[in-house]
Amino acid sequence: MRLGGLSKKLMAVALSSVMVVSGFAGLAPAVSVSAADDTAKLRMIFTSDLHGQLTTEDYETGKVYTTGGLSRTATLTKKAKAEVNAKNSLLFDLGDVLFDYTTDYIYDVNSSAQQPMYTAMAKMGYDAITLGNHEFDYTLDYIQKQLSSTGMSGKVVLSNVTNVNTGAHIWAENKIITKNLVTESGKTISVKVGLIGETVPTLAKKRTNYTGVLNGEDIVKNVKKEVPILQKKGADIIVVLAHSGIGEQKPAELDANTGYALTKISGVDAVLCGHLHKDFPDANGTKYDDYPGVNKTTGIVNGKPLVQIENRGASIGMVDLNIGTKNNKPTITGKSTQIRKVNASTEVDPTINAAFGNWTKTFMADSSQILSEVAADTQLQNYFGTMEDNDAIQLLNNIKISY
């Protein structure tokens, strides 16, 4: 009798336990993600060729600028970052931050003043930048001081520019950034992102001549040299930050535009481009669409993401890499590219827009100053300009000589 009663009690407890477990299972069904499918998205966002266009004003024309500007670009970069896990993004710039009316004015009027472009960029949290050819228009000493005073010097990666006499790099030859990416299931994948920074090897020489001072190495040759160096350092992924356009299929020695050729280099996983002030891929078509290995829709070229963007903050470029693991090592399982454009409805970041500070009044006054007036029905011509000087041509010549 006692054993029978005990058996009934045990059976009742077992049944109630099954009901409880089943009830909880119904409320929160378990979701299983296999290790092979559990990936993390690494999003790389970049700007390029900002050329001093910081605010919503075009001080060269005195008009409102609605299709670009870092103050609107900053909004796009924030949104792009917010779409992925906070640990899963990187922000880069490809150079030519300077070289426009505003940056030239500041340099000429007060060369010790901080360039607001770098002040603004320091607030945006760039992970790495490279330099464009036009940075070198402002002399090496000037650009070094600007980057140092704004805390941006440590962000610079410039692989193909060295000191002529010592062979030493002026800034970091390359860089590895370790990212602890968060996967879809909440786990972590540690990936070492290797960065190579390239600029136009002939530099720019408006105010100084770098002959005997700096040496610019051919971009393609330099990238081929840097890849094994980064691999030896343990880089899992290698990205080229190229102040260089896509260019020809077989660029000439010291060519400024080499992006397509860079996609053919073994070990390179993605190429980010600028310099030419044009988007690729572009729905309207580009001259590169018929190159071998080019997917004009996805921006995947020779199996690798290749993105080139416009100037003055008109667009940002993005490369998304899906990162998984194979044999306990990070591996790329998917890739995509994207370009996002600024327009009049893009929200303005007030902090970035205010970075010009007191310079704003100076620029507004200068751009609105009337130098001369011409009657509406006046006709200007220089039909005989090839035979003799005239006032119209001489004015232009004087401007060029002064510049």
Question: Which role fits each region the language model picked out?
Answer:
Residues 1-14:
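Bacterial Sec-dependent N-terminal signal peptides
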Residues 5, 30, 36-42, 65-68, ...:
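Non-catalytic terminal accessory segments
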Residues 7, 194-197, 283, 317, ...:
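Glycine-centered structural positions embedded in regular secondary structure
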Residues 15-23:
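Hydrophobic core
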Residues 36-341:
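Acidic, metal/ion-coordinating pockets
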